[in-house]
């Protein structure tokens, strides 16, 4: 049944987003609405609504350039660009990526990649390494695109608590979302 699992999602049409809090407030809260008329879903306040977000195209293209690959390279029946946009997480860099890097490099770089793969932080920057930063850190390394994709984690949906009632606004789902920003 569509919309009941990550393997069979329902499509929702984005309707609107408006800021609930005043600009400059300590908190940044948004009211977001989706049209679910075509999805045929029932829900109650407090149910979860999962959103599969796409990765940033600019970031994806930078990663493809670092790999020295073409965006049209075939991976798992899709283009490399499609897989990087929609199927894998680009942050943080997983231990399996550093393990892959350790297999295709040598010397000090191999030791550093092995340390990162085992959870150590030889340069004190592991907390800041997303996939692009990891490739930049090991800039001479160009793993094969298929192996690279296999080393990444699947993109997870972002789950939000529904703040509207299907009975009050049939076909229209509302979320109340607090923006969280980190400065590293």
Task: Name what the model sees in each region.
Residues 1-184:
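FNR-like FAD-binding dehydrogenase module
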């Amino acid at each position: 049944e569509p919309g009941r699992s990550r393997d069979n999602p329902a499509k929702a049409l984005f309707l609107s987003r408006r800021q609930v809090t005043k600009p400059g407030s300590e908190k940044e809260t948004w009211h977001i609405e989706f049209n679910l008329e075509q999805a045929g879903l029932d829900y109650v306040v407090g149910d979860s609504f999962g959103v599969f977000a796409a990765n940033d195209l600019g970031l994806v293209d930078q990663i493809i350039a670092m790999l020295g690959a073409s965006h049209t390279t075939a991976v798992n029946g899709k283009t490399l660009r499609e897989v990087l946009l929609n199927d894998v997480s680009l942050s943080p860099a997983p231990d399996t990526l550093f393990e892959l890097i350790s297999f295709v490099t040598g010397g000090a770089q191999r030791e550093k990649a092995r340390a990162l793969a085992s959870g150590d932080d030889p340069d004190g920057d592991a907390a800041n390494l997303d996939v692009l930063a990891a490739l930049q850190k090991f800039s001479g390394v160009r793993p094969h695109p298929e192996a690279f994709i296999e080393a990444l984690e699947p993109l997870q949906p972002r789950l939000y608590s529904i703040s509207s009632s299907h009975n009050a606004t049939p076909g229209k789902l509302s979320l109340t979302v607090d923006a969280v920003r980190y400065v590293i």
